Amino acid sequence: MTFVMGPALLFCPADRPERFQKAAERADAVILDLEDAVAAPDKQRARGAILAQLGGSGDGPELDPSRTIIRINPAGTEDFEKDLHCLAHTPYRTVMLAKAESVSQLRALPDFHVIALCETAAGVVHAPAIAAEPNVVAMMWGAEDLLASLGGTSSRNDDGGYRAVALHARSAVLLAAGASGKQAVDAVYVNIPDLDGLAAEARDAAASGFGSKACIHPSQVSAVRAAYAPSGEDVAAATELLDAARAAGAGVFQYQGRMIDGPILRHAESVLRRAT
């Protein structure tokens, strides 16, 4: 399965069913969160909310399974087993495994398409093996949990940029996904009012090869979508470059003072794909 959800994936606490439909309408896909967004005493109620919204009329779920992701609790926990029992009674087959750390954890989910969320040191180190698993459709990294697992206090410097260890993890997960032909999802941007900072980070994510970015608030969706949507000028430039390549009929040619070869042409093709 090729992961095609995105570019804006919106988290929604699974114990807030009144928000499910709105989240799904505002974003390209909704992530119903059974993990960090739900307090331990409320997790069973959250699972019940997922089941309840399916209804008993036979009309099917209110949420489109092809645009719905369920973030489940870490493997090896009691809540992980309860989450799977809940999902067995639903049509939802795309899950995000929190704190994915090993191949064996992914193999415990044979009936699901999995977004492996690497947010611990072990998860980042084992990302290449995790990404290679057949049921893994995408890889995501998490900054704050990663730094917490290392005993750190913040993933970002005072200027808002990521610390070196977070940048390393971001790149490692992206490269692991790419090496196995899987999609990569960029981490959330926790400073909700800072839409300019979010936009800059989302533009970097798109340019670097992340296929989508996770959001924690509906106000972030439009900024992410805009970052992934090439401008008219970008589309025109990419089209002209590809036209020039066809006219040149050569593997390497010069265009507007630049040397153009295969990788540059693939960059242009990527721009046009994002525009469709």
Which residue stretches match the model-derived regions?
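Expand to "…catalyze enediolate/carbanion chemistry for C-C bond making/breaking, isomerization
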Residues: 1-276
